[in-house]
Amino acid sequence: MLLAGIIGAGLLAMRDRVTDSGRAQAGVTLPRHDVASPEGQEMLRIFAEGVGKMMAMPEGDPRGWVFQWHIHAVPDDRSKTAELVRLYPNSSDPGRILAEAVWDTCEAHFDPLRVNFFLPWHRMHLMSFERLVRSITGATYFTMPYWNYTDPDHRSLPPQFRSPDDPRWKPLFRTDRNPGVNDGLPIDQVGEAPLGLNAMMSPVYADTPDGDAGFCANLDNAPHSSVHVDVGTREKGMGAVSWAANDPIFWLHHSNIDRIWASWNRAGGRNPKDEGYLGQVFTFVDETGKPVQRKVADVLDTAPLGYAYDHYLDRPPGSVPFPGLSGLRFTNHTASHRFSGPVTLGSDPTTVQLKADGNSPYVARLHTASMAHRPFYLRIGGVRITRQPGVSYEVHLDPMPLTAPDRVSRSYVGTINVFGAIVHGTHTGSGPAPYTNPRNYSFVITDLVRNLLQAGRLTEPPSVMLVPTGTPRSGAAPTVDNISLVSS
């Protein structure tokens, strides 16, 4: 979907319409471009210049690379307290006071109850970083390009991020990427997670207790977390929350995530209206290195913020109309009866047998819901992880027996990516700790259910299989509290 008229004036005109402060003039909207486009390539050149200059700054400079990285999360090989003391020995140093306020503030990755702030927090961070690049480079017309990896033709890391010997692009190179990524292989072939737009199928922004986990949480899972674990290692790369923002591709990735949010809103998706959401304030750093506070209510529309996207995305076929949810529900117990309560995920596929609630005939209710064109969801609820397992988990509905299902199987529902698997311990300096609250995931499976019904399957309540994409790390034992099949 093309945003008409946004590019017509060209880059030269944009230069004339932006003030020296790095902020667009009132009423001026600048486009963020696909990095593969000519305009996006110009923006990438400016971005690389800015990254290089930021990396050359002292680590304690609020405008510098390390400080900006730590806003997202302090690396997990040190505590926040130790890092503050290292960079600011004087406890009254203004830089230390600012760092105390802004480091480790991406709460959505650390506390599942804060997941609804995932999108506005990153929008604020991205906007502040964008303005910082303008100030550092003098290119006041700069906008953050986006990496359009949802297009199958653009799933290789842009070549400029893979050029360690080129002086211009060297600041964009990192070694802590998965094998093959820096060789130009498509990341969905190298990694474990798909890169579709199924999150846009959700009709509501936030979690609903018995069905849809919501657009925000689903987008956080995929393609957001998918890209993180597909690109970088889970030790000190994009696949680890506390190291992710050290890879410059982080910024182009989140520009695309922001574009998906804006696209969902343009399609009719509504953001929360409660004051607890709208009134939340976060602190960042402005282009002068001073603190700046932003309220969620002020960043829900990109136009007043001075930017738009050159292209927006349509919702995928099979998306659930806005809004609605109620109805049919099935709950889980384990097929082997070895578990009472939570199901523990191990190194082998885990099968969970669903059973029907209520007294009316199971198949009749399924067919009634399907004939009424009601959407179906599969909800994976209460996921608790005390240690990063180093793998993702594919979800399959009613897999055929005696087969090893994979992502091309007819039973494939989606993938659970555990990018933010544990609470980041640097808030207290005590090291990682288990989640206090569990995460919820959901998948729209309307077409899958209808196809299974047409094939004569689902004559009995189906099973759900969770398949690790590799061998989990020793000691990792994720648990799932409940699984539900819901029709709205």
Residue positions per predicted region:
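N-terminal export signals
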Residues: 1-19
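C-terminal accessory segments of proteins
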Residues: 18-488
